[in-house]
Design a protein with these regions (language model features):
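Short S/T/G/P-rich N-terminal loop/turn motif that feeds into the first structured element of a domain
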Residues: 1-49, 56-66, 82-99
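Short, flexible helix/strand-to-coil boundary loops that buttress conserved ligand/catalytic motifs
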Residues: 65, 74-77
Length: 99
């Protein structure tokens, strides 16, 4: 499976805008290729929002990246000028083992 992890530095984003963005990101959980998704704030740095997403394989991640519901969220993050760091890693875990 593929873990897609994104770190968003929201230090320059107003709280209301940030909450709305986090809700938009969380709504991506309903997309067919998303096996598991969580959005949460960093426990040590309150300015950071993290996205943890799991896909069954690299093809599912590729489809997600161009999905018409995902693209506007990415564009919004860019328009807000939010610095991001992305990490995509493959593991031999099974999606069925996730909570």
């Amino acid at each position: 499976m593929i873990w897609h992890v994104v770190r968003l530095d929201c230090s320059e984003v107003a709280e209301e805008e940030r909450r709305d963005l986090e809700a938009s990101i969380a709504a991506l959980a309903r997309l067919e290729d998303v096996a598991w998704l969580r959005v949460a704030r960093d426990v040590e740095d309150p300015n950071v929002t993290g996205l943890l997403t799991v896909f069954t394989d690299a093809d599912a991640l590729t489809r997600y990246r161009v999905h018409p519901e995902h693209v506007p969220v990415v564009e919004r993050i860019r328009a807000l000028g939010i610095p991001t760091v992305r990490l995509d890693v493959a593991t031999d875990d099974e999606v069925a083992d996730l909570p």
